[in-house]
Every structure is written in structure tokens, then in C-alpha cells.
Amino acid sequence: MAAENEASQESALGAYSPVDYMSITSFPRLPEDEPAPAVPLRGRKDEDAFLGDPDTDPDSFLKSARLQRLPSSSSEMGSQDGSPLRETRKDPFSAAASECSCRQDGLTVIVTACLTFATGVTVALIMQIYFGDPQIFHQGAVVTDAARCTSLGIEVLSKQGSSVDAAVAAALCLGIVAPHSSGLGGGGVMLVHDIRRNKSHLIDFRESAPGALREEALQRSWETKPGLLVGVPGMVKGLHEAHQLYGRLPWSQVLAFAAAVAQDGFNVTHDLAQALAEQPPPNASDRFRETFLPMGHPPLPGSLLRRPDLAAVLEVLGTYGPAAFYAGGNLTLEMVAEAQHAGGVITEEDFSNYSALLEKPVCGVYRGHLVLSPRPPHTGPALISALNILEGFNLTSLVSREQALHWVAETLKIALALASRLGDPIYDSTITESMDDMLSKVEAAYFRGQINDSQAAPVPLLPIYELNGAPTAAQVLIMGPDDFIVAMVSSLNRPFGSGLITPSGILLNSQMLDFSWPNRTANHPAPSLENSVQPGKRPLSFLLPTVVRPAEGLCGTYLALGANGAARGLSGLTQVLLNVLTLNRNLSDSLARGRLHPDLQTNLLQVDSEFTEEEIEFLEARGHHVEKVDVLSWVHGSRRTNNFIIGVKDPRSPDAAGATIL
């Protein structure tokens, strides 16, 4: 019976018995071969030498050996007396088909499980990327007009503050370190962009005219009564509004960062020392001299200056919020009294009626990018109009720089003339229509057709109205790990504003100078009706924080830019955007290259010190009246390309700093 079972097993396997691969690797004796003589044992060295012999390659051996059916170790026992050919009693194809089917079913289960798992993991990762908090603190940039304030912004980000938290702290810091440019007694505008959701908010805290201010009073006495120049400050309301929307750290903690700078002291910057030496307010008060000229003369750059008075103000604001500034408390009374004592008409009611505006920025498409900038009374539409006009020129690396400069100069003449028509749209509905025209590609094509490629226009193509703007301004640019971009520009108007300083140390602005009125000075263009003085109105502004992002998708170039210099700032921003988005230059090179600005009031084309004599001669040959100046404006910037972020200051600024978090 055992023999029959063995025979039956062998018959079932037949010629399809499995191959014993161990038999192959051990090189068994073939059935027809004679027994080989015993092979002596080799040592380890001899074995290594044998394996290294090229003639003992196993593949060569297998090819040369006369392999018949190699009996497996399991079948050799029952094959001593049997025929090598036996009847197959089981259909091998049926068995194979059944086995294959089972294998396919198992494979299907495995593949399905893997795909399901991979899909689940992918969906989870995508949701984490879009909706989860950053897992690692990395990648960000801060740029401001003072190195101390840049480092403060980085410090806030390092403590898990939001991009807006960092911007608020840095802006308040600039009011301490750069009091000639910005401060609690001024105003500004902030543009916040959420990269993930592609949403933007413009927080406009531009100063507004007091309710009792009249044009006639300014015409008569603006030079002798600095109190008339004071608008209702918007800085505190605007920063608080931004923090309410996007802040992460407590308001009091954010203000405490800046208060520490005022309390501990800071090194006087080159720009502040120069402003105190060359541009002190006319008829500076004793309080101003005590604060900024404690030794009777301007401090030297690098000397230590403390502002415990502002530290105390920030502590009060951190505890009680904007109400301490606007609701009739001691701070309000001090500001009203200081302005009225100098001939002003501002009242407590003006402060209580003030509110920051939350708006959408204007938007244009340029070279595959969205360009976001402030809406009127700011001149963002004129900036986008300039880009729309330039987009139609063949501006490539093959075009000479001189030819490109001519096109830029003629384009900016048009854009600045358009800007002179803007004002507060709440008081004039035609301004909204003008804004829509400036954003139109069709209008841009028309203006482009009016530009002569080889000759400057002998007369302006458009009527020109009076253009005024804050010559000094402070910039804060943030790209944080939270995927928010913040661009902010603030100002007091003239250096140190009106020159009026309260007992608490708050410098008051002179923003009413940005309105237009008749007979202001000799040789001024016609006053702009759109920018005339009215109670509660906000004057025309060249504060232009600007953000750029890809028009489609998330990947590509993002920019945050700001500028000072009033109308010169608009010219500077246009040329930097041209360098980055059209000529594909890096941000550092784009900020460093020479810039120009057409002064519409004098009909002079101003160029900065980076221009060569050859470039100036080319422009003069085209009919431009060129005036070379040292610096036109400072344009700072931050750039993000995919996951790489960098903050860059304008090299013309001796004190600004950009810092990048890696």
C-alpha cells in the first residue's frame, strides 16, 4: 500500500514535479554521470581564490551542463524503478487556473488595500497643509527702516506671534526709533494678504480733517499756525483693528515689546541724527528740545536715547486699548490742547468720531501676477495704470536700458497726472469712475499709443493738478511662517510732523498739508477739486504698501513692497516691479538699480546717483530735461518664491535692515 501511495504521488506529479533549487545550487550528480572522485577540502583562502576564478561562473556552468529533469529530494526516493515518463492523471491546466484565480483574488485585495491607504494618507496630508497649523517654525522675513525694529519683528515671530503681531510691534517701534517718520500721532495704511485663502484686507487709518477745519483758515495761516495742520491720528485705531482681525498674542503683550524698546533705550540712527540736524521743526518748542536735543545739540549717530514717556503711553494703551487714546481721557485732552494752543481747531469730538476703514485693495494683473495696492484716497490705481501701460511695450533683455528708461519716464508722467485726480471717494463719486478707468487695460492701450518711442512729449498729455504727499514715511514688511504677507507704510507727513509734542511725548502729524487749496505757493499747479479740504475728509496719499502674488495657483513669486518719498515712491515701486516681474532680476538687484522720477511741476526728469553719464545723455537726446539727485526714495521689499523667502532693504538707506528666518 505504501508503494502504491508513493507511485500514485509520483504519477500525480509526473514531469511537473517541482524543481529543488537547492539541488541546483549544490550541483547534484546528474543521473547519467559517473560518480565523481572525492574533492579535497579547501581552506578559506583557497575557496576565495576559487570563487574569484572567472572560469567558475555558476551561470556558465548551468549553460554547459547537460540538464535533464533534475529529481528533487522529495521525489528521488520513489523513482528508483519507475519509468521516467508516466501518465498524467490530473489536468494541470485546471489546477493552474484554479491556483492563478486564487492568486489574482489575493492580489486584488492587496492592491485595493494599498490604494485605499495611500489615498487616505494623501487626503490627510493635503488637509494638514491647507488647514493645519505650521508644524515647524521656519521661513519668514522682516524688513523695516531700523535694524532695532527689524529684530523686534523677528522676536515676535519667534514667540509664535502672527505676521500682524510682528507688524504692529515693529510699527510701534519705528514710532520710537524713527520719530521723524512715524508715530502714535500719525496714520498710515496696512495691506494684509492670506496666501492660503487668497484673501486680502486693506486697513486704512489715514488721518482725517477736523470737523471745524476750513480751507480759508489754511490759506491764511498754515505757515504760522502749525496746529491747523494736525489731522485726527489714526495709528492706534488702525493697529488695533489689524490685531483684532489677525492677532495671535494678547494686545498688551504686543505693545509691551515696543514699550521695552522705549524704556531700555535705543541707538540713534543716522537718519534721525540727520533729520534733527538738518530738518528740525520750525520754531521747535521747549518740550521738543528737551526730548530730542537734551544736550542742546543734535545727538550723534549711535548715541543712546531713552523714551520712558512713550513707554508709559504704550503701557496705558496696552491695558485700556484705543479708548485711552480716543475716548476723552488724558491722552486725548493733551493732544487737543497742544494743537489748539498752536492755532488748531481739532476737538475731542473729532477723536471720538474717528474710525479706521476696512476695505478691499485695488487689484490689477501684470505679467501673470496679481498686484494689490491701496484704493483712494491712496494712489494705488495710478500704480496699476503705469504697469498696464508698460505691459504693452516690448520690454525684454534685448531692449536697451536707455530705451526702456524713456518708456518708463513717459509712462510715469501719465500715471502721476492721473494720480492728481484722486481723492477721498466718500466725498466725490467721480473718483470711483476715475479709479475704474485707471485699472482698465483698454485705457492703458490708449495712453500707450500716445507715447512717442523716440521723443519726450513737449507738453503734458493730461491736465496736471497739485500733487502733495508725505516726504517721510516708515515701512514695515512681513512674510511670516503663518503664510500671511503684511505690508504697511505710515507717516507724520513732514519730518517730525507739525513739530508739536504733548506732555506724554506724542508727536502730532501735519497731514493737512496733503490737501490741495488755491494760492498755496507761487508756481503751483491748479488745485485739485477732488482733493480739496472738507471736514472729516482724508487727503490724497502716496502711502503705497503693495503685495504681489501669482494670478493662478499658489506656486510662483510673491512680493511685499513699500516706499517713501511721496510721488517719488510711486515711481520707485513701478520700476522695482518692472525689474522683478518683467526683466526677471533678483530682488536685491532690482532695489539697487538706478531709478528716475518725472517732476510734473518743474518738468524735470530726476534721476538718482546710480545713473551713468551715457544714460543721462541718451535721455537728454530724447528731449528730457534731466536733473541728477542723490536719492529719490527708499523702496524696501520681501520676496517669496515657492518655499524660499528673503527680506531686502534698499541699499540707499543707512539704517534699514532686512532679516530672514531660515
UniProtKB/Swiss-Prot annotation:
Pathway: Sulfur metabolism; glutathione metabolism
Record GO terms (molecular function): glutathione hydrolase activity; leukotriene C4 gamma-glutamyl transferase activity
Residue ranges with Low complexity bias: 72-83
Signal peptide: none
Pfam families referenced in this protein's UniProt entry, alphabetically: G_glu_transpept
Record key words, sorted: Acyltransferase, Glutathione biosynthesis, Glycoprotein, Hydrolase, Membrane, Phosphoprotein, Signal-anchor, Transferase, Transmembrane, Transmembrane helix, Zymogen
Region described as Disordered: 26-90
Glycan-bearing residues: N198, N267, N283, N330, N353, N394, N452, N519, N586
Residues that bear Phosphoserine: S17, S72, S79, S83
GO cellular component: plasma membrane
Record text on subunit structure and interactions: Heterodimer composed of the light and heavy chains. The active site is located in the light chain.
Protein name: Glutathione hydrolase 7
Record organism: Bos taurus (Bovine)
Protein's gene: GGT7
